[in-house]
Regions:
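Non-catalytic, solvent-exposed interaction/assembly segments
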Residues: 1-107, 149-152, 157-161, 186
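Short, solvent-exposed secondary-structure boundary motifs
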Residues: 1-5, 112-113, 180-182, 191
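Active-site neighborhood for divalent-cation/phosphate handling
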Residues: 75, 79-181
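Glycine-rich, charged/polar anion/phosphate-binding loops
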Residues: 177, 186-187
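Acidic, glycine-rich loop-and-beta core segments that form the ion-binding/anion-interacting portion
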Residues: 188-195
Length: 195
């Protein structure tokens, strides 16, 4: 535990179709440092086309991969992705942040089929000088509730508590931005080929 209770390490977990990957990042220095990595293959039929076919096997592999890095925490950062996640950038009337949640639910109903079966989140985006005083740009994210709940069950069975659940594309972007901040001023293309 760091000063004032801030943790010095973060454990990141990526569950791919063929591999479970765990990374331990130390935040005690001026820049984050990758200190441990473990990669464990999954059986061929454990995850097929992004759908978990055998949750018990997947949770066992996750548990073993976490143990391989000897992480002294069971709190991890995980992500969801694939065709069951919808990301939309929308323009809407400018409102105060506390009113935004209700407005985003209404906006989601316009963009997401069966809004009652998804988990919603949003981020109000900062505009560089071109923003209208009456409008705001918002990134709206919807993930199928079944997908999120299935991921949480697998993590729970593995004895893991997610500190946060991100979208895999955002996690890739954030990792790039932290490691290559100067590249963010130009055009950048990131490709997640996966395995």
């Amino acid at each position: 535990m760091g000063l004032f209770g801030r943790k010095k390490t973060t454990v990141g977990l990526d569950i791919g179709s063929g591999l479970v990957k765990v990374a331990v990042v130390d935040h005690s220095k001026s820049t984050p440092e990758l200190v441990k990595v473990a990669i464990t293959p999954l059986p061929d039929d454990a995850i097929v086309e992004g759908e978990v076919m055998d949750p018990h096997v997947v949770s066992d592999v996750i548990r073993a991969t976490i143990e391989a890095v000897d992480a002294n925490t069971k709190a991890v950062v995980a992500a969801v992705g694939g065709r069951d996640v919808i990301i939309k950038r929308i323009k809407t009337e400018r409102v105060k942040e506390q009113q935004a949640r209700e407005l985003m639910r209404w906006e989601a109903e316009q963009h997401v089929p069966d809004v009652d079966s998804v988990e919603l989140d949003f981020q109000i985006l900062e505009e560089n000088g071109s923003a209208s005083r009456d409008e705001m740009s918002v990134l709206l994210v919807a993930a199928k509730r079944d997908l999120v709940e299935a991921k949480l069950r697998i993590l729970s069975e593995a004895g893991i508590t997610p500190m946060s659940m991100d979208v895999d594309a955002f996690a890739l972007h954030n990792a790039f931005e932290v490691n290559y901040p100067s590249a963010m001023s130009g055009a950048v293309g990131l490709v997640n080929i996966g395995h």
